[in-house]
């Protein structure tokens, strides 16, 4: 989904979007029931918990400096390929609730995109990605995260009257 703007090789080397600590566990992607079942079939120890109409992984208690790797992350990248959660397909973009308005933001952790001019990122969103994100969020409201002020807002949703 982001191959036009984000180099897949850079992503494969970085993997920061697949590793969580206690401060960013709220970023855990929302999995569909089908994807959760597929992952459980390869690793029955994964603890999925309901989250809206989907599921998130419960990593258990994480110590202050402890890291949790997504169980779908392998040596070769994500084992889910094209079936990865929507959150993962659009990362480092996020959809968040900013004072009752949905907004597309960007995670500062992705140095590949965060270092680019904001105008370039907004232009990319305006080529259809923003519309796809808002449409998906209409069908799957559980992917809308509460706003975190560390995430610059790139685009606010404009509701037609």
Feature map (PLM): residue ranges:
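Short loop/turn segments that flank or connect secondary-structure elements
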Residues: 1-161
């Amino acid at each position: 989904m982001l191959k036009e703007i984000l180099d897949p090789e850079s992503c494969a080397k970085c993997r920061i979007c697949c590793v969580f600590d206690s401060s960013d566990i709220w970023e855990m992607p929302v999995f569909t029931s089908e994807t959760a079942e597929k992952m459980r079939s390869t690793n029955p120890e994964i603890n999925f918990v309901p989250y809206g109409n989907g599921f998130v992984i419960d990593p258990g208690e994480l110590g202050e400096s402890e890291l949790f790797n997504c169980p779908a992350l392998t040596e070769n990248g994500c084992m889910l390929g094209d079936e990865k959660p929507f959150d993962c397909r659009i990362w480092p973009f996020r959809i968040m609730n900013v004072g009752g308005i949905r907004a597309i933001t960007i995670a500062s952790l992705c140095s590949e995109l965060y270092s680019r001019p904001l105008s370039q990122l907004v232009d990319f969103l305006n080529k259809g990605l923003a519309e796809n994100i808002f449409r998906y969020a209409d069908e799957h409201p559980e992917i809308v995260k509460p706003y975190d002020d560390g995430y610059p807002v790139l685009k606010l949703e404009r509701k037609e009257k």
